[in-house]
Amino acid sequence: PIGQIASKIGRKRTIQCGIILLAVCFASGYVLTTTFSSINAIMFVVFALVGLAWAAINVNSLPMVVEMCKGSDLGKFTGYYYTASMAAQVVTPIVAGTLMRKIDYRVLFPYAALFVALSFVTMLFVHHGDAKAEAKKGLEAFEEMDD
């Protein structure tokens, strides 16, 4: 489903929508964890939406990288992509864990929201990587004329 959405509105816009949804979910998580003393049932919905948002981001990221590079550079840019994402997965548990130990576990949602907001800013600078629509041939070209 996410791939179909991306083919209609574009990968970049799909990723940006995923980032916005992720930020809203993290803000909701912060509000819910500071408002209620136990896990509220709505948190399950919030975390399901987090999964949807993450899918919108993750499913489209590598294809954007692949679309932006020439065939001879594919391995190099795929390596950059995975190095950046794995480095974040190494660093953030250390930083977030330290913050949670020094401050409180509730700092996790604002921490996540901050970096999600920064990722939105970086996506504003992306100008390439959307799939190019294939030109229709033969009778397929006339299908849209019936609408």
Enumerate the language-model features and the residues they cover.
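Helix-to-loop junctions at the C-terminal end of transmembrane segments
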Residues: 1-11, 100
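C-terminal ends and interior cores of transmembrane alpha-helices
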Residues: 21-37
